[in-house]
């Protein structure tokens, strides 16, 4: 299966009025800066002029900041990259971050778009970073996922 197979089109989203938080790590800055640019573009295209953006050092710091933003925002996007090395550290970090983000979304009923890349190589991360040479833009996809889910929840809550 080729990379990016099955990716849905990012829909036109009218999220004006929603409060969006974005947490992006600074480790692997070229990749994380590109992910952040993709998320910001989706936010702007969706009618959100000023998302709250917080930078943290690494991926392991992302969940606690996402948790705080989830208390005051309609949706949050988590952006970072973890590249496999020669030790089990990769597995611990990836599992902790993924489980933390899922728990936060469920505990707060706030959508969390997971744009934390977990790859075997830097090339794989670059290919998903939304750069001009990338096949995918996981930052944009994570923002679109968080915003569309927030709109879905608002719609459901208005009918309950």
Curated annotation (Swiss-Prot):
Pathway: Cofactor biosynthesis; riboflavin biosynthesis; riboflavin from 2-hydroxy-3-oxobutyl phosphate and 5-amino-6-(D-ribitylamino)uracil: step 1/2. Signal peptide: none annotated. 5-amino-6-(D-ribitylamino)uracil binds at residues 27, 59-61, 81-83, 114. Catalyzes the formation of 6,7-dimethyl-8-ribityllumazine by condensation of 5-amino-6-(D-ribitylamino)uracil with 3,4-dihydroxy-2-butanone 4-phosphate. This is the penultimate step in the biosynthesis of riboflavin. The active site is at 89 (proton donor). Keywords: Riboflavin biosynthesis, Transferase. GO terms for molecular function: 6,7-dimethyl-8-ribityllumazine synthase activity. It holds the Pfam family DMRL_synthase. It comes from Mycobacterium leprae (strain Br4923). InterPro entries: LS, LS/RS, LS/RS_sf. It is an enzyme of class 2 (transferase). (2S)-2-hydroxy-3-oxobutyl phosphate binds at residues 86-87, 128. This is 6,7-dimethyl-8-ribityllumazine synthase. Homopentamer. Its EC number is 2.5.1.78. GO terms for cellular component: cytosol; riboflavin synthase complex. GO terms for biological process: riboflavin biosynthetic process. It catalyses: (2S)-2-hydroxy-3-oxobutyl phosphate + 5-amino-6-(D-ribitylamino)uracil = 6,7-dimethyl-8-(1-D-ribityl)lumazine + phosphate + 2 H2O + H(+). Belongs to the DMRL synthase family. Coiled coil: none annotated. The lineage of its organism: Bacteria, Bacillati, Actinomycetota, Actinomycetes, Mycobacteriales.
């Amino acid at each position: 299966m080729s990379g990016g197979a099955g990716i849905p089109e990012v829909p036109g989203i009218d999220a004006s009025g929603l409060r969006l938080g974005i947490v992006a790590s600074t480790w692997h800055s070229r990749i994380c800066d590109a992910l952040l640019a993709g998320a910001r573009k989706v936010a702007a295209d969706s009618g959100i002029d000023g998302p709250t953006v917080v930078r943290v050092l690494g991926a392991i710091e992302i969940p606690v900041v996402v948790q705080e933003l989830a208390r005051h925002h309609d949706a949050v996007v988590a952006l970072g990259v973890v590249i496999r090395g020669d030790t089990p550290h990769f597995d611990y970090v990836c599992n902790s971050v993924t489980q933390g983000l899922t728990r936060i979304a469920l505990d707060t009923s706030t959508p969390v778009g997971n744009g934390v890349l977990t790859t075997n190589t830097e090339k794989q991360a670059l290919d998903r970073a939304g750069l001009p040479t990338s096949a995918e833009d996981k930052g944009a996809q994570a923002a679109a996922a968080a915003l569309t889910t927030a709109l879905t929840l608002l719609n459901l809550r208005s009918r309950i």
